[in-house]
Amino acid sequence: MFGDRQRPMVLVLGLGESGLAIARWCARHGCRLRIADTREAPPNLAALRAEGIDAEFVGGPFGPALLDGGVEIVGLSPGLSPLEPALATLLAAANERGVAVWGELEFFAQALRALGTSGYQPKVLAITGTNGKTTTTSLTGLLCQRAGKKVAVAGNISPAMLDRLAAAIDDTALPDVWVLELSSFQLETARTFAPDAAAILNITQDHLDWHGSFDAYAAAKGRIFGATTTRVLNRDDPVVMKFAPAAGAADAPRTITFGLNEPTQDGDYGLSRDNGIAWLVEAIDRDAPDETAPTTRRRKRDAHTPDIAHKRLMPADALRIRGLHNAANALAAFALARAIDLPAAPLLHALREYRGEAHRVEVIATIDDVDYVDDSKGTNVGATVAALDGLAQKTVLIAGGDGKGQDFAPLVAPVARWCRAVMLIGRDAPAIRDTLAETGVPLVEHPTLEAAVHAAAALAEPGDAVLLSPACASLDMFRNYAHRADVFRAAVDELAIDKGATP
């Protein structure tokens, strides 16, 4: 379970969800445990004690002394930035002493490898990206389930991977397929993780305060791929496409692309428009030796100039999730499921069934022919750009919060195109206002989200949307993005009552 180490001493840094899961997993396998957190009494400490986990707890600043006493592995929680000075010093000391630094994902990968010696060989699908991870992960899990597989969905989406694995072992119900949502934080410490297929949905600015630079952030996303992992890549995103192997490279991993245009390579996915109808399609090489075989067996890129036809899968309008960005997410999920040779028919039925996730471009009410849309999970600029372009209607946008050091310039074009006005809230409202001034769109700052909702409602016209897509984190005003969504929904409910409507 721990490479070539037998019951090692493990130092767990950070007692959040992943840190607690690492502690549980290590205790389960007889490891000696030391747990450290910068907080003297982190919320999960009570759970640790209640579960009877035998561990030394150290609260307060991190330092190299935490490695004393024979620590062999450091288990690093994903919320802790390795650039933070005290943690950076500790990790440098660990490196000097030959102490391994693993995150939960690496513990999980090592556990699957150990279970493999007993014959357990599940398929593993992984999803990352700045935006769309949770939707695509949930949808991929549903697709695999509808194809008759026993599925476990875990990771950044919750539950923690190690908790889900422990429960499956205890229930003697190990899944056929693991579908994992993975953040850049989780991937930063990946070493041996090698899923069967993995998707990068998009890469735009986010978490620059944690990674230090955009290049470092993008590189962390790329750690989702093992040497033989089938790569599912968004061809509309040039940063993502940097992870495509060079054409004709020896031993190159299989690559499948998806996008919102027509695919031009055998086995790729995209959209094709005919008589005003957008179709989800798969590119089929008419000259392939067996067009009925799964893509993974008939793909032969660069073998010749392909004669491509587009096989219609379903109308994009048949998806219950709104927006072109969600059509892209659906294509990515379908590509992942097909990459492990699941049959197409049940996958297409599942695509029509999926209703989406809360707080992700979710229409929560229509009042006086104005849609009120909750995209509180839109915590970065890329998410808000996708929401505006995906809705593709006149919108009064509510944005603002903690910008995390982002550049707001990518908002200029979609705001100029789609927004009737922008209501601004939170710490970085002035920075967003300054960036968007060139659009000529009315920009109004408000002290509260409730005030912004009522002002937006007064400006919206029939056929418009009032969209909460903050492009920012929430912690400057709210407990989390879900709390922000709750406040938005309550304000919309109040508005509906005032207007005598049913939200």
UniProtKB/Swiss-Prot annotation:
| CC per GO annotation | cytoplasm
Catalytic activity from the UniProt record: UDP-N-acetyl-alpha-D-muramoyl-L-alanine + D-glutamate + ATP = UDP-N-acetyl-alpha-D-muramoyl-L-alanyl-D-glutamate + ADP + phosphate + H(+)
What Enzyme Commission number(s) apply to this enzyme? 6.3.2.9
Copy the pathway line from the protein's UniProt record. Cell wall biogenesis; peptidoglycan biosynthesis
Chain positions recorded as ATP binding sites: 129-135
Q: Does the keyword Cell wall biogenesis/degradation apply?
A: yes
Write down the top EC class of this protein: ligase
Q: Name one GO molecular function term.
A: UDP-N-acetylmuramoylalanine-D-glutamate ligase activity
Localisation: Cytoplasm
| Alphabetically ordered keywords of this record | ATP-binding, Cell cycle, Cell division, Cell shape, Cell wall biogenesis/degradation, Cytoplasm, Ligase, Nucleotide-binding, Peptidoglycan synthesis
Q: What is its main location?
A: cytoplasm
Q: Which GO terms describe its biological process?
A: cell division; cell wall organization; peptidoglycan biosynthetic process; regulation of cell shape
Q: Which family does it belong to?
A: Belongs to the MurCDEF family.
State the protein's purpose: Cell wall formation. Catalyzes the addition of glutamate to the nucleotide precursor UDP-N-acetylmuramoyl-L-alanine (UMA).
State the name under which the record lists this protein: UDP-N-acetylmuramoylalanine--D-glutamate ligase
Q: Which organism is it from?
A: Burkholderia multivorans (strain ATCC 17616 / 249)
Source lineage: Bacteria, Pseudomonadati, Pseudomonadota, Betaproteobacteria, Burkholderiales
- Corresponding gene? murD
